[in-house]
Amino acid sequence: MAPTPPAPLTVEKIRADVADCLGEDPADIPVDENLVDHGLDSVRVMALLERWRREHGVTAGFADLAERPAIEAWAPLLGAV
């Protein structure tokens, strides 16, 4: 029996994971704003990326996410549906 492929990320899951990482409510994290302005740093980006690689099979690199730290910019890079 073949292993089940990982579930794709959604914009809401990305938002929820970022909010969890920052100790915030997802409703307080806008999808179109720079996440650095909300306290996201490189260590947290790496932690999120490793989690998404493990749980969702994401292949994006750190530099891709660091270049434009906003959920709406990350969604296509992370294969969000």
Q: Language model features by range: what are they?
A:
Residues A2-V81:
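Phosphopantetheine-dependent thiolation modules in NRPS/PKS and related acyl-activating systems
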